[in-house]
């Protein structure tokens, strides 16, 4: 579960390395974000040569959480880290590669992210 002020790793090659969640998009009173939710985040750490710079406000989609996630088929998945993928206004990923495992449930809303991922669970 991701809430405000949570630090996340970035699971793509957009240039950002660490994000901090500042808002959950979608509901005004929603406290926690889960896998597949869109968040507003600020870049806390970035590669020096990237187009994305530190303290930029961006949107990202959650792809991995430490909290258990129950799949549609009943399987329970837990990851080692909290991670997100940076997206643009059209909800397409900014990066061209996705690192790490991605759940298949993202296919419903973020088909492009699932197609870029090497590991889909």
UniProtKB/Swiss-Prot annotation:
Q: Give yes or no: UniProt keyword RNA-binding.
A: yes
Annotated disulfide bonds = none
Which GO MF terms are attached to this record? Answer: large ribosomal subunit rRNA binding; structural constituent of ribosome
Protein name listed in UniProt: Large ribosomal subunit protein uL14c
Query: What HAMAP family does its record include?
Result: Ribosomal_uL14
Entry-linked Pfam families:
Ribosomal_L14
User: InterPro entries, per this entry?
Assistant: Ribosomal_uL14 (IPR000218), Ribosomal_uL14_bac-type (IPR005745), Ribosomal_uL14_CS (IPR019972), Ribosomal_uL14_sf (IPR036853)
| Organism, scientific name | Pelargonium hortorum
The principal localisation class reads plastid
């Amino acid at each position: 579960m991701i809430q405000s002020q949570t630090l996340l790793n970035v699971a793509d090659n957009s240039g950002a390395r660490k994000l901090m969640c500042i808002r959950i998009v979608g509901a005004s009173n929603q406290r926690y974000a889960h896998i597949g939710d869109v968040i507003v985040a600020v870049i806390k750490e970035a590669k020096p040569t990237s187009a994305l710079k530190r303290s930029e406000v961006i949107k990202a989609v959650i792809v991995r959480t430490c909290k258990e996630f129950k799949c549609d088929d009943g399987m329970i998945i837990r990851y080692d880290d909290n991670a997100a993928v940076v997206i643009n206004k059209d909800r397409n990923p900014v990066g061209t590669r996705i690192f790490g495992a991605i759940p298949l449930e993202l296919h419903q809303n973020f088909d492009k992210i699932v197609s870029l991922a090497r590991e889909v669970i």
